[in-house]
Regions:
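Short sequence/structural segments immediately N-terminal
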Residues: 1-179
Length: 179
């Protein structure tokens, strides 16, 4: 199983589900040890927390499980960001059971983002587009998917400041400043 090759399955790291007193899968999926016993007795199984776009577990519950450990890290601005407001689950982008999470890999990240951001895919097919298609740029080079205080989920406070990260020569002074 791939999950045993991920950052979530490190028994020597107390921050991970497998390093927290042996809770393992139940750390994220809730109590499930009695599933088989209850079925044998003719009782219904307690529902398990499931993750992803097609899961029957409410997105708020899915995200609460993830944010229980990750809220203090890269998702400080998650609450009230566009992904939160639009009820996008963490698992819609992240796959914690795979050794290589596609959204964290520069070459595959755009395809994960394009699942929802369909119009952006066509924009990056144009001749004059940034080199996302070629794997030289990822969505997260300019945008902060976990939320930000900047407009358009940018990694810097303004559009210009974000662009200047790569295009310092455009900083000016200019005869007419960019808007």
């Amino acid at each position: 199983v791939d999950v045993f090759h991920t950052a979530h399955a490190q028994p020597n790291d107390a921050r991970t589900p497998f390093g927290k007193g042996g809770l393992q899968c139940e750390s994220c999926h809730g109590p499930g040890g009695n599933h088989a016993k209850r079925v044998k007795k003719g009782e219904s199984r307690p529902s398990m927390i499931k993750f992803g776009r097609t899961a029957d577990t409410p997105v708020s519950v899915q995200n609460a499980m993830c944010l229980g450990c990750h809220e203090k890290t890269a998702v400080a601005n998650w609450h009230m960001g566009p992904h939160d407001v639009n009820s996008v689950s963490c698992a819609a982008c992240h796959d914690s059971h795979k050794a290589k999470d596609a959204v964290l890999t520069r070459a595959t990240q755009p395809d994960v983002c394009y699942t929802c951001h369909v119009a952006e895919r066509s924009q990056f097919q144009k001749v004059y587009a940034h080199p996302v298609r070629q794997g030289k740029l990822a969505c997260s080079d300019c945008h902060a998917p976990h939320g930000t205080v900047a407009q358009k989920q940018l990694v810097r406070a303004t559009v210009n400041d974000t662009c200047y990260e790569c295009h310092a020569e455009k900083r000016g002074p200019m005869l007419w400043e960019h808007q």
